[in-house]
From Swiss-Prot:
Record-given protein name: Thiamine-phosphate synthase
Enzyme Commission number(s): 2.5.1.3
Family per record: Belongs to the thiamine-phosphate synthase family.
NCBIfam families: thiE
Entry keyword Magnesium: yes
Pathway connected to this protein: Cofactor biosynthesis; thiamine diphosphate biosynthesis; thiamine phosphate from 4-amino-2-methyl-5-diphosphomethylpyrimidine and 4-methyl-5-(2-phosphoethyl)-thiazole: step 1/1
Lineage, highest ranks first: Bacteria, Pseudomonadati, Pseudomonadota, Gammaproteobacteria, Pseudomonadales
Transmembrane segments: none
Cofactor descriptive note: Binds 1 Mg(2+) ion per subunit.
Gene Ontology terms describing biological process: thiamine biosynthetic process; thiamine diphosphate biosynthetic process
Length: 209
């Protein structure tokens, strides 16, 4: 279950990918080498979210990547794909029981090893720490340090995701300190074209070679 949990973890952003960019930009990230793709949409438009998630699931299957749904157990269960839960998004243990042993489920742990311990105990496939740098998506999130990665790497067998303001410039330091994956939104998708997204994804993926 965790063999492929290494490399670029692309996360979508609805406002950033408005105007028909979602699918072409997501596919560009996958072509460039993203191993995980998280569909993150906080709107209440259930019909659109289902349509978009289904389309993304097909893209991930085509490119050998894993789709993760943010904070929607029902949608993840309906599509048979992965799930990411924040601290207020419901029980990870319940999600594991619902989705089964083989589905990838991740948990947000902010900057706290104790939260990671709980996530692991409840069946998390990976543990996500951050924000490590200033983040456009969650500017008020608690800050994490690279020392936290050192501690997490020695304490947990699960893959570690670093998130929050990650760029091509600062990602190598996170990887060197134990990040199995770097989760990227703006540094990947705030681009003028799908080709630019593909080039950025390829550059991020190369950091793990």
């Amino acid at each position: 279950m965790t063999a492929a949990l290494r490399g670029l973890y692309a996360i979508t952003d609805t406002p950033l990918l408005a105007g028909g960019k979602l699918l072409p930009y997501a596919e560009a990230a996958l072509i460039g080498g993203a191993r995980l793709l998280q569909y993150r949409d906080k709107s209440g438009d259930a019909v659109r979210r289902l349509d978009e998630a289904q389309a993304l699931a097909e893209l991930c299957q085509r490119h050998g990547a894993t789709l993760i749904i943010n904070d929607d157990l029902e949608l993840a269960a309906h599509l048979g794909v992965g799930l990411h839960l924040g601290q207020t998004d419901g029980s990870l243990a319940a999600a594991r029981a619902r989705l089964g042993a083989d589905v990838v489920i991740g948990g947000t742990c902010h900057a706290q090893l104790e939260l990671a311990e709980r996530a692991v105990a409840e069946g998390a496939s990976y543990i996500a720490f951050g924000r490590f740098f200033n983040s456009n998506t969650k500017p008020g999130a608690p800050a994490a340090t690279v020392e936290l990665l050192d501690q997490a790497r020695t304490r947990f067998a699960q893959p570690i995701v670093a998130i929050g303001g990650v760029t091509l410039d600062n990602a190598p330091g996170l990887i060197a300190r134990g990040a199995s994956m770097v989760a990227v939104i703006h540094a990947l998708f705030a681009a003028d074209s799908a080709l630019e997204v593909q080039d950025r994804a390829r550059a991020f993926a190369a950091l793990f070679d």
